[in-house]
């Protein structure tokens, strides 16, 4: 019996009936094309739809580059975005977590790809997410050259989704970080964070649960914002200010992105054996969100320091003779910079604290 001669109601199942709507996916692609084009840069044409994204490294102006790659996600911060129904900021977080890991190695981010997985595709939700990704790419100066949208019924609860990002950058071989001349007496600078960034949100969510507040409640630490809005403040992207400072003078020897694990886990990753970072904790202007989290959750200072950035999202190890130049270059790009300490001989721990954190 041909398909045309089958009795009504006896046609075969469709992919849409199984839970995957190809038309919704195509609609989303059409809606995000202008967002993708807004991330154009030398080396990328800003078009999507092919089987792979293209990038012309020569057009980007490098002579003898080393490619640097990073991938990351946003973690359980996504759960707050889902529950608060705010989806246009987590894309910035996704880009930030990847490109900040590139710039700490001295690399300029070139292009970015994303992975968006959900149980039931909502084109409007997807467009909101990609609008954030595009904004993050513009802030970082990298092109969004492709991605994957996966609709997987049965894998996620209704409304849930996950994100992953992939970034590739390049640096001239002689400008890679960390440098090999980090020495005792080098100065440690801290760049202010925009808030919690994208780490520690399992603890954040537990503290909010204990507080009895909801995502639509007034944020106790940020007048004029709901708790959801305040906690979803996007991760700061440090790429352009740091690249400007690196190019302005030869003063930056190492950079450390302060993510999960805080100071004690991230700073030692860029230090040579035998050296430790001495951090003056009272120098940190702790944002109110961290004081609220610490007090509401009864979290000890050392636990705060190994879970959150506590107000410092990026660390720079700087030649003492070039400190003023580096600070000036960063300040010119809008960064709030504080002198946090210095490099010292390592006896035991890779990070040594002086004083107390003002929580």
Swiss-Prot record:
Q: In which pathway does it act?
A: Purine metabolism; IMP biosynthesis via de novo pathway; 5-amino-1-(5-phospho-D-ribosyl)imidazole from N(2)-formyl-N(1)-(5-phospho-D-ribosyl)glycinamide: step 2/2
Q: Where in the cell is it found?
A: Cytoplasm
Recorded catalytic reaction(s): these are:
2-formamido-N(1)-(5-O-phospho-beta-D-ribosyl)acetamidine + ATP = 5-amino-1-(5-phospho-beta-D-ribosyl)imidazole + ADP + phosphate + H(+)
Any one GO BP annotation for this protein: adenine biosynthetic process
Recorded E.C. number(s)?
6.3.3.1
The enzyme's main class, written as a single word, is: ligase
Sequence similarity: Belongs to the AIR synthase family.
Q: Which UniProt key words apply to this protein?
A: ATP-binding, Cytoplasm, Ligase, Nucleotide-binding, Purine biosynthesis
Pfam families named in the record: AIRS (PF00586), AIRS_C (PF02769)
Q: Which GO terms describe its cellular component?
A: cytosol
Keyword Ligase set for record: yes
The answer to whether the entry has keyword Ligase is yes
The molecular function terms in GO held by this entry are: ATP binding; phosphoribosylamine-glycine ligase activity; phosphoribosylformylglycinamidine cyclo-ligase activity
| Disulfide linkage | none
What's the protein here called?
Phosphoribosylformylglycinamidine cyclo-ligase
Q: Which PANTHER family match?
A: TRIFUNCTIONAL PURINE BIOSYNTHETIC PROTEIN ADENOSINE-3, TRIFUNCTIONAL PURINE BIOSYNTHETIC PROTEIN ADENOSINE-3-RELATED
Primary site of residence: cytoplasm
